[in-house]
Amino acid sequence: MDEQQLQQLTEQLSLTYFKKPFRHRAYFNSRLKTTGGRYLLNSHNIELNKKYLTEHGQKELEGIIKHELCHYHLHLEGKGYKHRDKDFRTLLKEVGAPRFCTPLEKEKKPQRKVRTYKCEACGQTFLRKRKMDTSRYVCGKCGGKIKEIIKKG
């Protein structure tokens, strides 16, 4: 789906569910990471996350568009457009728009190596994510020398 098709879909959904025209822009914003879409109060445009279309399909995207159109139409009418407002929650139910969107699959970060250090005097162990210069630090418990324990295999 390209930007023009998205614009047409948004205009069509606005007329079908709200019986009002959508006179601004709807477009994909690749910078959106954790949200399905957002309604911009100043420009009245709607930004959408394209990942929802690729991961969850057009039905999910239509739900997000309807949700953002609720914000859009209520804001232009001067009614309560925020999530906590009664006008907003009522309109969501009327048009069948979701209150929240389905979460995206999280991109898993590579797991960091955990380094283990041990005090030579008292045996206190320290787990660290970052490498530590053992010549600059001493054990906080007894003041003894610290040595890195290297696990084999």
Swiss-Prot record:
The active site is at E68. Residues 6-148 form the SprT-like domain. One of its GO terms (biological process) is response to stress. Its cofactor is Zn(2+). GO terms for molecular function: zinc ion binding. Its main location: cytoplasm. One of its GO terms (cellular component) is cytoplasm. Zn(2+) binds at H67, H71. It is found in: Cytoplasm. Transmembrane segments: none annotated. Binds 1 zinc ion. Keywords: Cytoplasm, Metal-binding, Zinc. It comes from the Bacteria. Belongs to the SprT family. This is Protein SprT-like. It comes from Bacillus licheniformis (strain ATCC 14580 / DSM 13 / JCM 2505 / CCUG 7422 / NBRC 12200 / NCIMB 9375 / NCTC 10341 / NRRL NRS-1264 / Gibson 46).
